[in-house]
Amino acid sequence: MDGLTAAEQRELASRMERKQLKEFMTMYSKLVQRCFDNCVNDFTTKSLISREEGCIMRCVDKYMKASSRLNERFQEQNAAMMQGGQLPGR
């Protein structure tokens, strides 16, 4: 961000913030859709039955753990690239 004016830095930060929010909302929407499609199949009541509730909890937990692990791996690879080394495991 060197070489940018203060106004340009603020604009860049604002754009990055909007992009991150959009990506978060997309991820959240996909999570809701996937877990709903996989877990909810009884539409005879207005509430979730206990089996569906448990399935959704496991689905969300699994998705969050997978996302966290992927994020860790990306950070590891990014750090290795920044140090000029090769990607881990190569």
UniProtKB/Swiss-Prot annotation:
It is found in: Mitochondrion inner membrane. Mitochondrial intermembrane chaperone that participates in the import and insertion of multi-pass transmembrane proteins into the mitochondrial inner membrane. Also required for the transfer of beta-barrel precursors from the TOM complex to the sorting and assembly machinery (SAM complex) of the outer membrane. Acts as a chaperone-like protein that protects the hydrophobic precursors from aggregation and guide them through the mitochondrial intermembrane space. Heterohexamer; composed of 3 copies of TIM9 and 3 copies of TIM10, named soluble 70 kDa complex. Associates with the TIM22 complex, whose core is composed of TIM22 and TIM54. Interacts with the transmembrane regions of multi-pass transmembrane proteins in transit. Disulfide bonds join C35-C59, C39-C55. The keyword NAD does not apply. This is Mitochondrial import inner membrane translocase subunit tim9. GO terms for cellular component: mitochondrial inner membrane. One of its GO terms (biological process) is protein insertion into mitochondrial inner membrane. It is a peripheral membrane protein. GO terms for molecular function: metal ion binding. The twin CX3C motif contains 4 conserved Cys residues that form 2 disulfide bonds in the mitochondrial intermembrane space. However, during the transit of TIM9 from cytoplasm into mitochondrion, the Cys residues probably coordinate zinc, thereby preventing folding and allowing its transfer across mitochondrial outer membrane. The keyword Transport applies. SUPFAM superfamilies: Tim10-like. A motif (Twin CX3C motif) lies at residues 35-59. Pfam families: zf-Tim10_DDP. It comes from Aspergillus fumigatus (strain ATCC MYA-4609 / CBS 101355 / FGSC A1100 / Af293) (Neosartorya fumigata). Belongs to the small Tim family. Keywords: Chaperone, Disulfide bond, Membrane, Metal-binding, Mitochondrion, Mitochondrion inner membrane, Protein transport, Translocation, Transport, Zinc.
